[in-house]
């Protein structure tokens, strides 16, 4: 049984919002999540067609069914049958029908434009496209696992995707052929040599007068030499000798090549020597590049001395403590000093005693 939209209760629910725990049709999804900036940031996805209570994460292309992660593990037999499986990326914002068609053209049938009415709420669809969708549309992919083979996620790197316009490499006219060799399908994640990124061997050299596109060059306006070396910007792309390697991996999960994106800092030391000045120029805290680690201090050496000093201070304080006697009940003490005793104990009136505080003879 097809689930109904929780908002209008008439149309088929296609979207599941985990923040609102609601099943929505496309019309109500645009209406609800365009109300305020907070709802605009809600993460949604297609609804799971098995349990109808979770966002779908995987789409079986052979069965044409969307599954959430739990249903895919326990209910579906796609893995055993060898079906083709496509991962679904969540989204946020208010995508237009054109954006929906681009994202799920192979999934939603009929097209999204046929599922959306020409009027959403009280605004025509064309007005929404010109105002809200063009200014507030944002695609936010989540939980993207980077693997060594990017063939499953070619749509994420597609030039048609408008989610990240700043990452699209713009080439000048006549320079498209030079970047055809840029293939990320078989590229490993950890690059020890900069030439491995663009598939060049160490024996290949680029002629100085050869035109290189802007996406593969360092900033042309910067002609200053690198710190601690005689290399200039014009020779930055020359291949290094086989024995010399430059490690550009700084601990990120997905290393990006500075040569590829044109972000090599002019003070980068190609010789491989790192100093505090280089990191200060690039905005990195010098605390990360100290000659000694923060835990490699002289604390172990000075520990016995500090312990002895602490013991001396404790003994001095102990000697200065005052244990003066304080009479708690002065009236009782005054009476006790005048009572008669026998073997140190008080005696009753009329009984024999061996000590009388008022008699000087008994005291002696």
UniProtKB/Swiss-Prot annotation:
Residues the record lists as binding Zn(2+): 5, 8, 28, 33
GO cellular component, one term: nucleus
Superkingdom of source: Eukaryota
Zinc finger (B box-type): 5-47, 48-88
Molecular functions (GO terms): DNA-binding transcription factor activity; transcription cis-regulatory region binding; zinc ion binding
InterPro entries: CCT_domain, CONSTANS-like_Bbox1, Znf_B-box
Protein name: Zinc finger protein CONSTANS-LIKE 12
Organism: Arabidopsis thaliana (Mouse-ear cress)
Gene expressing this chain: COL12
